[in-house]
């Protein structure tokens, strides 16, 4: 079962856009990707999710991030489902969908729960441009995902790469609003420097271990 911080496994997969090597394809392109599994094609909750992901596709692309769907259905089922969504809902699904028919990748990533049947649960894997798994979320089959949270998660992870942490509900935190947290000082010298920076107004803080600032682009 995959965990945060490890490399995404090297696999070659069949998708609605042809064969795809992960994470190699996106490492070479210098892109992040969000891999999300769904229980099955031609199901109501999954259909609403795919429409929602597609409507936010431009937001993900602005974050240098691509989308990939996955289920254990055949690629022919994926293709017909995408056609149905276009015909009935007038939404063109532009991202690829993996046909993991034998469930090899789904099992490797822990997307199938023995307590929830043989289909994949609603998993979300955020993988950065080095092929490292940065975040994992699991939802049960009966609960649709919050797409705004997935977008927020990618933004927060990319913000963390700039040396900051993000507070609860960022960028709408009750205490800090859109500001970001400076990681706590780990030695006395840095502690003193933080306190001085707060006095000068260079940064803000409640104490030496709880300092925050505006996000610098």
Swiss-Prot record:
The active site is at 46 (cysteine sulfenic acid (-soh) intermediate). Pfam families: 1-cysPrx_C, AhpC-TSA. It is an enzyme of class 1 (oxidoreductase). Substrate binds at residue 122. It catalyses: a hydroperoxide + [thioredoxin]-dithiol = an alcohol + [thioredoxin]-disulfide + H2O. Its EC number is 1.11.1.24. SUPFAM superfamilies: Thioredoxin-like (SSF52833). It is found in: Cytoplasm. One of its GO terms (molecular function) is thioredoxin peroxidase activity. Signal peptide: none annotated. Coiled coil: none annotated. GO terms for biological process: cell redox homeostasis; cellular response to stress; hydrogen peroxide catabolic process; response to oxidative stress. Its main location: cytoplasm. Residues 2-159 form the Thioredoxin domain. InterPro entries: AhpC/TSA, Peroxiredoxin, Peroxiredoxin_AhpC-typ, Peroxiredoxin_C, Peroxiredoxin_TDXH, PRX_1cys, Thioredoxin-like_sf, Thioredoxin_domain. One of its GO terms (cellular component) is cytosol. Thiol-specific peroxidase that catalyzes the reduction of hydrogen peroxide and organic hydroperoxides to water and alcohols, respectively. Plays a role in cell protection against oxidative stress by detoxifying peroxides. PANTHER family: THIOREDOXIN PEROXIDASE (PTHR10681), THIOREDOXIN-DEPENDENT PEROXIDE REDUCTASE, MITOCHONDRIAL (PTHR10681:SF128). Belongs to the peroxiredoxin family. Prx6 subfamily. The active site is a conserved redox-active cysteine residue, the peroxidatic cysteine (C(P)), which makes the nucleophilic attack on the peroxide substrate. The peroxide oxidizes the C(P)-SH to cysteine sulfenic acid (C(P)-SOH), which then reacts with another cysteine residue, the resolving cysteine (C(R)), to form a disulfide bridge. The disulfide is subsequently reduced by an appropriate electron donor to complete the catalytic cycle. This is Peroxiredoxin.
């Amino acid at each position: 079962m995959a965990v945060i911080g490890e490399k995404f496994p090297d696999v070659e997969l069949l998708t609605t856009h042809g064969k795809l090597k992960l994470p190699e394809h996106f490492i070479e392109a210098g892109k992040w990707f969000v891999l999300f599994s769904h229980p099955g094609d031609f199901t109501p909750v999954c259909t609403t999710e795919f429409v929602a992901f597609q409507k936010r596709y431009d937001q993900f692309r602005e974050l240098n991030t691509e989308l990939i769907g996955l289920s254990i259905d055949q690629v022919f089922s994926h293709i017909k489902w995408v056609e149905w969504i276009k015909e009935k809902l007038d939404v063109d699904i532009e991202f690829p969908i993996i046909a993991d028919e034998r469930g090899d990748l789904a099992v490797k990533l822990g997307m199938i729960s023995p307590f929830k049947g043989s289909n994949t649960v609603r998993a979300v894997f955020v993988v950065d441009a080095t092929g490292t798994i940065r975040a994992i979320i699991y939802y049960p089959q009966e609960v649709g995902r919050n797409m705004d949270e997935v977008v927020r998660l990618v933004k927060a992870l990319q913000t963390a790469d700039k040396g900051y942490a993000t507070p609860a509900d960022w960028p709408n935190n009750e205490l800090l609003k859109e500001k970001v947290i400076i990681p706590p000082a780990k030695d006395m010298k840095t502690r003193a420097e933080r306190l001085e920076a707060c006095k000068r107004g260079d940064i803000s803080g409640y104490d030496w271990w709880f300092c925050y600032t505006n996000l610098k682009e």
